[in-house]
Amino acid sequence: MPRRSSRRTGITWAEASDNVLTAARSRAAGGMNVYYIGYNMDMAIEYIEACALWARVFNAAVSEIEPGEELFEQDGDRVIKTYTIRFESGFRIVALSSRPANLRGKQGVVVIDEAAFHSDLDELLKAALALLIWGGRVHVISTHNGDQNPFNVLINDIRAGRRAGKVHRVDFREAVADGLYRRVCLRRRIDWTAEGETQWVADVYKFYGEAANEELDVSPSQGSGAWLSQSLIEARSID
């Protein structure tokens, strides 16, 4: 299930809430392990902290966050760290590094975050899709990183019926309509106004400039730097 999303719209935060509910359920109720894969350690920490927050909100019985040993590549350094939250259900949420071999022999839900920016997404997907055979799920979340990126190829293949799956799309304006700016106001402790929201949206688009098409409007750029319209994307997907 790929999700094409704009920058900073809360997709990972929302995914964490769903993942906590999944891991907190019993096996009979559909519970299973969740494996989160970001492309650096900071993403793993942010995600696990979001899961811990949601676990408290849902009053899910969990242990403390447990550090473990795994290799993350970050700025040329090899950092040994994973993070695990264990639930009373017996299931756990684990943040792993981006090595495809990490998923071998595992079962549950796989979340690949900012998939278009992983160095070996094709191999990572191969390893993740094996979990579907025994009833697992694979959630692939990302902003775009060009039209030739494996993430965009995956989306086009699903739209064309060459691969199974569902594609979800959340662009920046949709997120604003659903309350993104209201949440920003809450975090910044300022009052929401319609005029303020309009100006804020305009300012965000202005500082992204030409990159707003890809970063905010979920339209992948061509290799030449031009942008693909939504209608052209859909037309190409069924050629």
Name each region found by the language model:
Residues 29-96, 235:
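Conserved nucleotide-state-sensing and coupling region of NTP-binding domains
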Residues 1-18:
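Walker A/P-loop
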